Amino acid sequence: MSGWRKIYYKLLNLPLKLLVKSKVIPADPVSELGLDPSRPILYVLPYNSKADLLTLRAQCLAQDLPDPLIPLEIDGVQLPSHVFIENGPRVFRYYVPKQESVKLFHDYLDLHRNNPALDIQMLPVSVMFGRSPGREGHGTPHLRVLNGVQKFFAVLWLGRDSFVRFSTTVSLRRMASEHGTDKTIAHKLARVARMHFSRQRLAAVGPSLPARQDLFKKLLASKAIEKAVADEARSKKISHEKAQQNAITLMEEIAANFSYEAVRLSDRVLSWTWNRLYQGINVHNAERVRQLAQDGHEIVYVPCHRSHMDYLLLSYVLYHQGLVPPHIAAGINLNFWPAGPIFRRLGAFFIRRTFKGNKLYSTVFREYLGELFTRGYSVEYFVEGGRSRTGRLLEPKTGTLSMTIQAMLRGGTRPITLVPIYIGYEHVMEVGTYAKELRGAIKEKENLLQMLRGLRKLRNLGQGYVNFGEPLPLTTYLNTHVPQWRDAIDPIEAQRPSWLTPAVNDLANQIMVRINNAAAANAMNLCSTALLASRQRSLTREQLLEQLDCYLQLMRNAPYAKDTTVPDKTPEELLNHALNMNKFEVEKDTIGDIIILPREQAVLMTYYRNNIQHLLILPSLIASMVMYHRRITRTELLHKISMIYPMLKAELFLHYSKEQLPETLDTLIDELARQQLICDKGSELVLNPARIRPLQLLAAGVRETLQRYAITLSLLSATPSINRGALEKESRIMAQRLSVLHGINAPEFFDKAVFSTLVATLREEGYISDSGDAIQEHTLEVYNMLSALMTPEVKLTIESVSMPAETSNQPEAPETPETPEPEGKTES
């Protein structure tokens, strides 16, 4: 580089240092993209901009990547280490410099032809200042590039809203070996790079925004809404104009009013807020979503719903991943001042809890959703319908998902892909309110005062987690499961073919399974799981560390799913982090520390335990069986677990099929044997008395679930003809009684939805016949197996209410072996 050019870059870099604060995507490009800084890198930028080049250089130096301003010297030939695909627009249009990218690509390919050991990494990088999509019909399109003067003002105004996006590298060695090294390949490389940057920019900025009134006019002109308006006028005996005004009022209630400036401002506020409230936001598997957006997919984000914070956190994460914040389906309860107008500008559109009896509303909403898909906006909705009060996934509500498929049946949309997302927290600000609601308190209506009270509680929130699950392409799903689905395409009438409901139900279940597959274990949910497993809710520091180590080894050596994330910290680091959250008490004595979960915190901590209960449910069940039997063959263990696995699978959205269960159990048994929690004697699995303490705590994780199943099966066995409604009601009443008598603090223990799912599963699995009567022989077999795993006191409580005298006089199961309770603080 010449001396004058060095001076020029230094002078240009002075204002850029002050004005530009760019974000890098992905956050750690070297590890996430598999870059090798020791090998030569050719940086490829979309168009000639010195501001972009120097912004890239700053990030390269920060990431320990080669300097793009230093040329590469290979075999005595010196070539630039960066290339611009286009020269870009100029202030003076008549000056069009010669394009150098094709020549440079050809030179590099030539070097590979002459040097078989050479392998240069071609690294596409885009630098963006601002991400305004612009308005339809206003000025130049948003994909335009900027000339020097425009770039100056962009840097001045948007320097702190800029990002540097690194893409996956292309091996020039592979290109040379597979496609040759002539100029045709160089031209092709430049053309493919140009398309790559264009798609990437569209994924980051999104399509132009329509004027709200223009959108309403277009919706009003649709055949479906015209018909619904005519039906409204006829059924309510009002004028056509009045019915049309009703439709416009509904559009005003529903539609978002997306504003890029509002997104920019909220990003500043949220960045400041997250940095003070959270110790970190952990994001995993975002690259798969960036790739979907770049490939032109219409993305529908379907996260689990833990907190009102979900709306803001997910939009914030997506924005920082270089993606357009989605249009979000929010409950109408959030449409209060000032939150409603703010959420609208951030992309929220509002949805009522029920559409029943209002055909005009359902038509307007469906057409609005379809229009979002047609225009190419990403959409987000919570398939659970509302926030989980227990920390578990709720049964999915399928209305909006059904409308998504109906939007495909209008024709003309891009390929729609559902992206399940697991959102996890170490502290959920509403968890105290959830506990009150589960105890019968009336849910407060959201308002400004409630919002301010919530903001007051925002402190020391620990870590947040956003894990993107395995995408589910709708077209691929329908082609596989409903090959004739295209026969139902109709651009006017909303279609409800016979296959729609079963397909939607199956899709909803797959989404929930994939959300759970992407679960995040963390310090809070692991410590809560261990302490709640102790009957005294207390463990010595050594016991707790031992139990955390047991959980971590299980999750690492026998992982639940490839998308599940496990902390890379030691048990000591996790415990210290959890103690800093001020949820637990520490009592010190001369022997050591005792970690205590206070009584008032116990119910709240079940929320965090339930976030990951599905990850440990099968190891807990194995531990429980070995604890009771002391000696059991693998075959017998598999038989017993197979009987109740369908109930666990339906309740916790587990992903293992019946065919996968034997192999899964073998893997878990091998890991428990490796940890010496059990002894594998070849023909039998045997209890290891030396490690009974961690085994007992592990077994406790399934205790309450099995008790709940035993309640329903005992009622079915005693009264085979009981109807479904009565069975669910009686089960809940008995569960509440059991929780009072035996100190069970889990709010989901008598949750209505849990018993509803259980009864439905019993019917599907053949325990209840088509006539509605229980098959007593089957229900008794499972009940006897479950009751043997419970303490005599719990069994007696259940049978004293549900089982008639002759049924209770079954041959007694072997006495439950005496096993020492882990030492800890006893209850006062």
From Swiss-Prot:
It comes from the Bacteria. Pfam families: Acyltransferase, GPAT_C. CDD domains: LPLAT_DHAPAT-like. One of its GO terms (biological process) is CDP-diacylglycerol biosynthetic process. Residues 802-828 are annotated as: Disordered. Its EC number is 2.3.1.15. SUPFAM superfamilies: Glycerol-3-phosphate (1)-acyltransferase (SSF69593). GO terms for cellular component: plasma membrane. GO terms for molecular function: glycerol-3-phosphate O-acyltransferase activity. SMART domains: PlsC. The keyword Cell membrane applies. A motif (HXXXXD motif) lies at residues 304-309. NCBIfam families: plsB, PRK04974.1. HAMAP family: Glyc3P_acyltrans. Belongs to the GPAT/DAPAT family. The HXXXXD motif is essential for acyltransferase activity and may constitute the binding site for the phosphate moiety of the glycerol-3-phosphate. This is Glycerol-3-phosphate acyltransferase.
